[in-house]
């Protein structure tokens, strides 16, 4: 979908979602009010994104699926579930849709947020083949190594596995460093999916 001046609405929405995602992950620095405001905008963008890509859902029931198509469906389905969990628990925490206990909503919001972040990186990697544009693969694996180091440093795994009820951020970390590190972690999963697809196409 394009506007009169040739602006691709899908790309605008996608870039907007990426920026919102980073800001939402920076909750320790933005505070609750801004986080809720950004979260509501993210939900709106998410709905628009799926509306603009509604034809993809119709294609699910057509023909036999390849391994890569099955991977697409799996990642997108898990992402849809995790973002639904983020939205539902977030609206509960904000007091708009109190359908579960505050304790459950808090745990659900933290876990689903990190899974959504990881899956969003994989989702972008399905559509954006960054590794094809980088001739030197050493650079690709170097960036991935940095992502792995920052993934470990920020203890992302404990949030994915629901091993912590709270988000821990060092007092020495500022918002710019925090967002840069999370961006590198996001890029790690984009590149990881690029590598996976590349290997699948070889078989």
Language model features with spans:
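Membrane-embedded alpha-helical bundles that constitute the cytochrome b-like, heme-associated redox core
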Residues: 1-203
């Amino acid at each position: 979908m394009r506007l009169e001046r040739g602006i691709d609405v899908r790309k605008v929405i996608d870039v907007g979602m990426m920026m919102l995602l980073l800001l939402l992950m920076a909750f320790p620095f933005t505070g609750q009010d801004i986080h809720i405001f950004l979260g509501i905008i993210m939900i709106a963008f998410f709905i628009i994104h799926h509306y603009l890509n509604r034809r993809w859902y119709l294609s699910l029931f057509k023909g036999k699926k390849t391994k890569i198509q099955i991977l697409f469906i799996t990642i997108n389905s898990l992402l849809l579930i995790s973002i639904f969990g983020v939205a539902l628990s977030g609206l509960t925490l904000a007091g708009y849709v109190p359908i579960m206990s505050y304790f459950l909503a808090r745990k659900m919001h933290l876990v689903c947020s990190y899974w959504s972040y990881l899956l969003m990186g994989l989702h972008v990697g399905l559509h954006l083949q960054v590794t094809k544009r980088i001739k030197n693969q050493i650079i690709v694996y170097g960036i991935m190594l940095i992502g792995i180091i920052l993934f470990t440093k920020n203890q992302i795994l404990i949030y994915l596995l629901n091993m912590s009820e709270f988000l821990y951020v060092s007092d020495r970390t500022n918002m710019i460093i925090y967002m840069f590190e999370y961006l590198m972690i996001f890029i790690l999963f984009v590149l990881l999916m690029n590598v996976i697809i590349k290997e699948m196409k070889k078989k």
